[in-house]
Amino acid sequence: MEWNESLLRLTVAFVLGSTLGIERQWRQRMAGLRTNTLVAIGAALFVIVSVLTNHDSSPTRIPAQIVSGIGFLAGGVILKEGLTVKGLNTAATLWCSAAVGTLCGQGLFSEAVLGSMMVLVANIALRPLSTFINHQPMHSTELECHYLCHLVCRGDEEANVRRILLDSLAEIKNIKLRSLRSHDLDEFNHFVEVEAAIICTARKDKFLEAVISKLSLNPSVKSVSWQALEQESG
C-alpha cells in the first residue's frame, strides 16, 4: 500500500469520525467530537497495520480485537444515577465509530459513508420517536403501578414536609394519592414517620426518584425511601 492510499483512508476515517462526534458534542455527551474522531482514526490505523503486514493470514483478526478493545472505552461512558442509566447511546456510537474506522482502514469507503449516515439517522431522527413512545401509556394492558413512600422527619416540621411531598407529587402526570398517613416514632414527638401510598397508570420510577431526592435535601428530613409494589392489570 502506498503512503497516499494510507493518507486517504485515515482522512476519510477522520472526516466520518468527526461527523459522528459532532452530533454527540452538540448534545454535550461525555464522548464527543475528539473521542469519536480518535476512535475512528485508531481503528483505521490498526487495520492499515494489518494490511501492511504481508504475512498476516487472518484479515479479520485485527477487526475482532478492535471490537473487544472498544468495549473498555465504551464501558467508561456508561453511568448509573439512581434508577437511570446514562451513556448507553454514546457507548453504542463509539462502537459504531470504531466500525466506521475499520471500514476506512480496509478502503471500503462507500460502506463507511453509508454506515455513518445510518448512525446519524439513528441518533437524530429516531430520538423524537423514542421519546414519544416512552411517554405513551400501555393502553392494551392498562397496568396500574403501586408505590409506597416512607420518610422520617422532625415532629415540628411534619406539616411542612407533607405539603412539600404533596406539591412534588402534584407535578407528576397520571398519578393518584391513595393515602397519606403519619405516626409518631417516639412519645415525645421528636420524629414522625410519613407514609404515602401512590397509584400510577404507568411506571414512574424516574419521577419518584426525583421527588425523593428533593425531599432528602430538606434538613428536617432524617430518612426517606420509596418502593414499587405489585402491578395490577385492569
Curated annotation (Swiss-Prot):
Membrane topology type: Multi-pass membrane protein
Transmembrane segments: 32-52, 62-82, 106-126
Keyword Transmembrane helix: yes
Coiled coil: none
Compartments (UniProt record): Cell membrane
Classification via Pfam families: MgtC, MgtC_SapB_C
Superkingdom per UniProt: Bacteria
Predominant place of localization: membrane
GO cellular component: plasma membrane
InterPro entries per record: MgtC-like_C, MgtC/SapB/SrpB/YhiD_fam, MgtC_SapB_SrpB_YhiD_N
Keywords: Cell membrane, Membrane, Transmembrane, Transmembrane helix
Family: Belongs to the MgtC/SapB family.
Protein name: Uncharacterized protein slr0014
Organism this protein belongs to: Synechocystis sp. (strain ATCC 27184 / PCC 6803 / Kazusa)
